[in-house]
Amino acid sequence: MAEWHKIIEDISKNNKFEDAAIVDYKTTKNVLAAIPNRTFAKINPGEVIPLITNHNILKPLIGQKFCIVYTNSLMDENTYAMELLTGYAPVSPIVIARTHTALIFLMGKPTTSRRDVYRTCRDHATRVRATGN
């Protein structure tokens, strides 16, 4: 879908963010669009399934790297987002937002606030949800 690549392009132009990817969670659970050669481009189906099925997950593996869950409301229909921190130095904020068909992964730089990452990821997810995807 061309819309996914447009979201990744918009994010990659912004200097506040380090990595971004969009992953299908309904059918194939594969990466649909991502910034090339980064952590989120390596996300595999085995890492996506625990995110959407296990509400009490504490240290998920994302792109073969451990992360620490800060808040988890990913499957909540009103919030549809999960906040994480990287489990390695330098610590960066990560937000995963859920649309009807995909998960939007967004990692900020270590100097970017969690609020900026959360707001940007939720805005993209809300826009996509409004179109029905």
UniProtKB/Swiss-Prot annotation:
UniProtKB keywords: Actin-binding
What are the GO MF terms of this UniProt record? actin binding
Pfam families this protein is in?
Answer: Profilin
Q: What residue intervals traverse the membrane?
A: none
Signal sequence, renumbered to the chain: none
What the record says about family reads: Belongs to the profilin family.
Q: What does this protein do?
A: More likely to influence phosphoinositide metabolism than actin assembly.
Specify the protein name: Profilin
